[in-house]
């Protein structure tokens, strides 16, 4: 049985709609119209000093600045952790990650870390008749204990913890497998070329950053010297799934496009979108539109790319005339 108490302090009061009796059809319709859409975008490894709104002078982030100027800004904020998996766990569950096992930085083949009996933020929105979606970086595991089988339907997944729709990066872009998962299936996977993933030892014969440094377009650091995919050495080893592999330069476009599609598809109903960007986490491989544009190297370039993503979401909301009824 799921319990609501963990997340009650975290849910916006606008979503906690409590009534007595049976509302008329008109009242129900008005209630639907009054529910704001909610978009929670979580960037990765972005510092307060990276944004021009907060004082950055060598890089400009006009779209994020516009968002800040139209809303609230926070100059004193805290997270449950400084790393990916535990901070996302705390955000979605309302629980301290150190009070549950296996909430350290998850490998790419980790089981689903959030207990399916736990009430998540997505569960609470869904209970209030929101259509819920998770798009982008996930890094909270997928599948059962013992590891994820990426060659069949992946269960449990985000749809077992409150999300109606998912299009996600299973872990992080610097970790294998380098594929997208949409609604429990690896996108573009050829069944004749199954994926194998291991974080203990090498699998298959794909080159690695350690053994074949001449093949990389980005030098490895901090253990990023295992299987090479798209010229980038990753953490962990994989083989197979050639038709499903992402292209790093296109990831921001793909994730942003899926988020926009989600918004357009559900513009006539209240929706909750949890969107995790790859930017500005390593490996920093910007699209050619942004490569070299900041004058500050790859990190500066992907900050520009992140700002573009925010701008695309804002433009979509504006074009659908739902920006004023969306908390972003």
Residue positions per predicted region:
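Formylglycine-dependent sulfatase
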Residues: 2-4, 12, 20-328
């Amino acid at each position: 049985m799921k319990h609501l108490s963990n997340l009650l302090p975290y849910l916006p009061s606008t979503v906690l709609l409590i009534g007595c009796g049976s509302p008329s059809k008109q009242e129900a319709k008005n209630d639907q119209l009054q529910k704001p859409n909610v978009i929670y975008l979580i960037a990765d490894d972005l510092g307060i000093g990276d944004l021009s709104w907060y004082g950055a002078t060598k890089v400009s982030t006009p779209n994020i600045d516009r968002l800040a100027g139209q809303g609230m800004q926070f100059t004193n904020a805290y997270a449950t952790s400084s790393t990916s998996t535990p901070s996302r766990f705390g955000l979605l569950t309302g629980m301290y990650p150190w009070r549950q096992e296996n909430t350290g930085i998850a490998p790419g083949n980790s089981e689903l870390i959030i207990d399916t009996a736990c009430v998540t933020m997505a569960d609470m929105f869904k209970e209030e008749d929101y259509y819920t979606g998770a798009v982008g970086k996930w890094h909270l595991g997928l599948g059962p204990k013992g590891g994820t089988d990426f060659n069949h339907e992946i269960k449990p997944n985000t749809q077992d913890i409150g999300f109606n729709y998912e299009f996600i990066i299973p872990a992080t872009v610097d970790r294998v497998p380098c594929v997208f998962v949409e609604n429990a299936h690896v996108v573009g996977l050829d069944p004749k070329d199954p994926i194998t993933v291991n974080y203990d030892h090498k699998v298959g014969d794909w080159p690695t950053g350690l053994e074949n440094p001449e093949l990389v377009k980005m030098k490895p650091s901090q253990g990023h010297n295992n299987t090479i995919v798209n010229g980038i050495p990753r953490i962990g080893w994989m083989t197979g799934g050639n038709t499903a592999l992402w292209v790093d330069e296109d990831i921001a476009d793909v994730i942003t496009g899926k988020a926009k599609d989600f918004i357009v598809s559900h513009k006539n109903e209240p929706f909750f979108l949890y969107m995790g960007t790859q930017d500005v986490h390593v490996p920093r491989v910007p699209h050619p539109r942004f490569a070299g544009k900041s004058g500050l190297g790859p990190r500066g370039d992907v900050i520009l790319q992140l700002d573009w993503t925010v701008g695309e979401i804002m433009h979509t909301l504006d074009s659908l005339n739902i920006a004023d009824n969306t908390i972003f």
